[in-house]
């Protein structure tokens, strides 16, 4: 559960992401594909090369979903229900991949905003991404 301080930290951090959410999403995906090559199996039809249009487009979807989640911190299950259905029932993504992408998102955010990425912000973002991952995998059960 996100505390009031966590919610404030997440909103503050995400406000700095702003219009870069899609870029950061794509960068995190590229980082995940490089660091955890088994994640590529869910994207056999994608050109996974650096800067590919498909990775950029999916990165925008990731960024948009996280922006939506930040706007609904008090109702993540409601905000992400359709996305949870998609990943559980249609795409059947291994739940561990959400944790891997979360890690890569944290690294990406830290690289782009090193002065703002304090231990408190890091902890709050980690909790937020963990909550998002939990919601996205909740329908697997």
Swiss-Prot record:
Matching SUPFAM superfamilies: Globin-like
Gene Ontology cellular-component terms listed: blood microparticle; haptoglobin-hemoglobin complex; hemoglobin complex
Tissue spec. comment: Red blood cells.
Gene Ontology annotations of biological process type: hydrogen peroxide catabolic process
InterPro entries referenced in this protein's UniProt entry, alphabetically: Globin (IPR000971), Globin-like_sf (IPR009050), Globin/Proto (IPR012292), Hemoglobin_a-typ (IPR002338), Hemoglobin_oxygen_transport (IPR050056), Hemoglobin_pi (IPR002339)
Residue numbers bearing the N6-succinyllysine modification: 7, 11, 16, 40
Keyword line: Acetylation, Heme, Iron, Metal-binding, Oxygen transport, Phosphoprotein, Transport
Residues that bear Phosphoserine: 3, 49, 102, 124, 138
Binding annotation for O2: 58
Self-association and partners: Heterotetramer of two alpha chains and two beta chains.
Family statement drawn from the similarity comment of this UniProt entry: Belongs to the globin family.
Domain Globin: 1-141
List of residues that carry Phosphothreonine: 8, 108, 134, 137
PANTHER family documented for this protein: HEMOGLOBIN FAMILY MEMBER, HEMOGLOBIN SUBUNIT ALPHA
Protein name as annotated: Hemoglobin subunit alpha-1/2
